[in-house]
Amino acid sequence: MASPGYRRLLAAALLPWCCAAWALGHLDPPSPPPLVIWHGMGDSCCNPMSMGSIKKMVEKEIPGIYVLSLEIGKNMVEDVENSFFLNVNLQVGMACQILEKDPKLQHGYNAIGFSQGGQFLRAVAQRCPTPPMMTLISVGGQHQGVFGLPRCPGESSHICDFIRKSLNAGAYSKVVQERLVQAQYWHDPIKEEVYRNCSIFLADINQERHINESYKENLMALKKFVMVKFFNDSIVDPVDSEWFGFYRSGQAKETIPLQETTLYTEDRLGLKKMDKAGKLVFLAKEGDHLQISKEWFTAHIIPFLK
């Protein structure tokens, strides 16, 4: 029969293991990855009819998730104005600072960009690897740019009228490039050399002047890059840009898919390697620009956020 001293020694030795086993059995479930959202042209971070609604939907579908909807400016009015008139490179820099300072994002986050917010968040992924972006979802983003005049009916229609006139007057002039957001991803397939030399944003993040290896490495670090294309899009021209396709160089009628572009065949951004590794996801949806139902969003987007 064991002595009292031996029993006490055995109990002392087993106690930490018992406590550890009990603790492991009562661990809280891991928190879902945080989510960062960037709105599109003429929208704001917190519009209850758009990004505010998306934020609430995600929070309902994924309990406990932290959602940050980026506000570029001091308030919603500035946020809307900046989506038209603040240099995109400055906007991306501001977004990077916001993300870097947020303690809830330091272990990584997922991101959803709506319309132009899609290519803006891709720029964040390429330029600012800290904190790390895990999955990027681009909903109607224009990753090869646009070559069509923007249409935005409603309250912003007068601004779009001004944008059309400015782009017609000279999309690649220095003053238009520096002061008009949409000019900074204007891609003229008939004037490719002018575009490459004068585009202050898109030509840079698409590696069309020179190769920045860090851009490539940072984008390839994504777990998934999801692109949503709208078949009946009346805003984005060409719509293939939403899947990284574009017009064949030298004309503006025939479009080619991503896999036939120089960007892909020369793998200037790492997209070819990502495609082969199964990291690129192409989703298609009937309907016009950003026309998304709650049911579609829940079925096709929410699974990437868990």
Swiss-Prot record:
Similarity-based family: Belongs to the palmitoyl-protein thioesterase family.
Activity regulation field: Palmitoylation reduces PPT1 enzymatic activity.
Catalytic activity: S-hexadecanoyl-L-cysteinyl-[protein] + H2O = L-cysteinyl-[protein] + hexadecanoate + H(+); hexadecanoyl-CoA + H2O = hexadecanoate + CoA + H(+); S-hexadecanoyl-N-acetylcysteamine + H2O = N-acetylcysteamine + hexadecanoate + H(+); S-hexadecanoyl-N-acetylcysteine methyl ester + H2O = N-acetylcysteine methyl ester + hexadecanoate + H(+)
Subunit structure: Interacts with CLN5, ATP5F1A and ATP5F1B.
The protein, known as: Palmitoyl-protein thioesterase 1
Keywords: Disulfide bond, Endoplasmic reticulum, Glycoprotein, Golgi apparatus, Hydrolase, Lysosome, Secreted, Signal
Transport as UniProt keyword: no
Glycosylated sites: N197, N212, N232
PANTHER family per the UniProt record, alphabetical: PALMITOYL-PROTEIN THIOESTERASE 1, PALMITOYL-PROTEIN THIOESTERASE/DOLICHYLDIPHOSPHATASE 1
Leader peptide range in chain numbering: 1-27
UniProt note on tissues of expression: Highest amounts in brain, testis, lung, and spleen. Lowest amounts in liver and skeletal muscle.
Cellular component, GO annotation: axon; cytosol; dendrite; extracellular region; extracellular space; Golgi apparatus; lysosomal membrane; lysosome
Enzyme Commission number: 3.1.2.2, 3.1.2.22
Domain of life per record: Eukaryota
Record has Endoplasmic reticulum as a keyword: yes
Primary location: other
An annotated Gene Ontology molecular function: sulfatide binding
Post-translational modification: Glycosylated.
Function: Has thioesterase activity against fatty acid thioesters with 14-18 carbons, including palmitoyl-CoA, S-palmitoyl-N-acetylcysteamine, and palmitoylated proteins. In contrast to PPT2, PPT1 can hydrolyze palmitoylated proteins and palmitoylcysteine.
GN (gene name): Ppt1
Cystine crosslinks: C45-C46, C96-C128, C152-C160
